[in-house]
Structure formats: structure tokens, C-alpha cells
Amino acid sequence: MKNRVSSIPFNIRKDNNKKKLIGKAGEDRVADHLKADGWKILERNFRYHKKEVDIIACKDDIITFVEVKTRKSVEFGLGLEAVDKHKRKNILGVARYYIELKKLHDFNVRFDVASIYRTSFLYIEDAFQA
């Protein structure tokens, strides 16, 4: 077992770490954007089972669950294209759990998607419905 782990090429681990750093930088940019617009960040990288929502924020009577997709290349498509039916279902599941956990039933709920590619930044409010 130990030999299997050590046989993984170093560059794969390095690339995985680089992807995490790129993703975190994108999430930081979106969190800053939300804060500048008056949103309070409630959670970052909130997990429920093996599913995750990148940012949960609130403003007035709205709570938004934000999926952030950061790309350094469009080789595999734009970030928005990665928020498919399966990903939306996962986000909805986490949102339901979070609302129940925190007793936020009186809030209006919104699902936003942010896509970052190099210097371009696209933020879509109400990107999909529950």
C-alpha cells in the first residue's frame, strides 16, 4: 500500500495543489466582491457529507449559495459549463441541510454561480432554481 502511494508521480500532487490554490484565489475574489456589495460571508467551503458549497452569504433577507469555478484554461470548457445538473443537485442538498441546521427558513434563497477565467469575472445571480 505504501509503495502504491509513493509511485504516484510528483507532478500530479504538485498539479493538484496548484489547482487548489487557483480555486482558493477565485473564491477569495468572489468573497471580496460579495463583501464590497454588502454581503456577509457566513461560510466558506461548507461541507455536508462529500458535497460542498464554496460560499454561503447573506444580505437583508436573502441567503445565497455560491458556486465558484476558476479556470486558467478553457481547454475543458468555461467554469459555468461545469455547474451541470449533478452539481446543482449537490448544491441544493447542501443548501437544504444548511437551512435546516441554522434555522434559516425565513430567508429567501438564491443560487449564484461565479466564473473566473484569467482576468475576466462573471457573476450570475439566481443562476438556477431549487
What residue ranges belong to the model's regions?
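Acidic-basic catalytic patches of nuclease active cores, encompassing PD-(D/E)XK
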Residues: 1-44
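Catalytic cores of nucleic-acid endonucleases
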Residues: 9, 70-119
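Hydrophobic pocket-lining residues within nucleotide cofactor-binding pockets
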Residues: 46, 116, 128
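Conserved catalytic cores of phosphodiester-cleaving nucleases, focusing on short active-site segments
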Residues: 53-76, 91
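Short acidic/glycine-enriched loop/turn segments that link adjacent beta-strands
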Residues: 48-51
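Short, low-complexity, polybasic intrinsically disordered segments
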Residues: 119-130
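Structural motif
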Residues: 63-65, 108, 121
